[in-house]
C-alpha cells in the first residue's frame, strides 16, 4: 500500500449538499492538507478522502472528528485503507486491534471481495462474511470503482463455502447496499477484475508519478519532462549526420580530382 494512505482519511456520512470548502473547514486545523477528493453520489450520503502532509495530522483528525455531528449527520472518519491506525474513536473500525490492542489473526484461507459501497467498513464486511464461517481477519480499502476488501477464514472449508454462498449477494450496512463479488484471493490479485488488470497496469505505468493526489504532481507530466531532452538529441544526431555526409562528399570529390587523368599539352 502506498504511503499516502497512511496520511489519507476517509470521511463518510456527509450531507448531500456539502461543498469542498466546508470539508476543508472541518479538517484544516489538524494540519496542512494536500488534497480533498469529495464524492457526492446520486443518493446521499456523500463521502470524501482528505490527504494530510503528516500521518500524525491524519490521526488527530480521526480522533477529533469521528462521530462529530455536522448539520445533523454523524460523521464517520477513519484511515482510508481500512482503519489500520488505532485511536479510541476508531477502534470499532479497525480489525487490526481488539479492545486490548492485541493484533488479530491472519490465515492463508483468504478471499477477495469487490464491489463494496464506499461507506463499507471492515466491521460491516466481517459481519456479512461471517455468514459463511469463522472470520479471523477483515480489511477494506478504496479502489478505482469504490471499495474492496480481503477476508481471512480460519479454515479451508469456510473459505470455499463463502465463495459459493456469498458471491453475487447483496451487501448492506447502515448507509448503503451493493451486490458484491467474492473469489479466492491470489497473491497477485488486486482490487480490480481480471479482465482489466493488464490494461490498468499498463496505463498506470505510462502515467507514472503524475497519478499522485497532489495538485503539483498532477501538473507535471513525465512525457513533457522527457521530450525536451529527446529533441536536442535528435537534432544533434541529424547535424552530425549532415556534417559527416558533407565530409564524405568533399573527400570523394578530392579523390576523383586526384585520380582523373591529366590531359597532354600539345606544343605548336
Curated annotation (Swiss-Prot):
GO molecular function terms noted in the UniProt entry: RNA binding
Main location class: nucleus
This protein's GO cellular component annotations are: cytosol; nuclear speck; nucleus; spliceosomal complex
Concerning its family, UniProt says: Belongs to the splicing factor SR family. SR subfamily.
Give UniProt keywords alphabetically: Cytoplasm, mRNA processing, mRNA splicing, Nucleus, Phosphoprotein, Repeat, RNA-binding, Spliceosome
Q: Where is the composition biased (Low complexity)?
A: 207-247, 257-268
Q: List the disulfide bonds.
A: none
Q: Which GO terms describe its biological process?
A: mRNA processing; RNA splicing
Q: Where is the RRM domain?
A: 7-82, 109-187
Q: What is the lineage of its organism?
A: Eukaryota, Viridiplantae, Streptophyta, Embryophyta, Tracheophyta
Q: Which organism is it from?
A: Arabidopsis thaliana
Q: Any idea what this protein is called? A: Serine/arginine-rich splicing factor SR30
Induction info: Up-regulated by paraquat, high salt and early after high-light irradiation. Down-regulated by cold.
**Posttranslational modification:** Phosphorylated.
The subcellular location is: Nucleus speckle; Nucleus, Nucleoplasm; Cytoplasm
Assembly information from the UniProt record? Component of the spliceosome. Interacts with SNRNP35, CYP59 and CYP63.
Q: Where does the record place the modification Phosphoserine? A: 193, 210, 212, 214, 219, 221, 227, 236, 246, 256, 260
Also noted in the record is:
The splicing pattern of the pre-mRNA is regulated in a tissue-specific manner and by development, and changes in response to various types of stress treatment or light regimes.
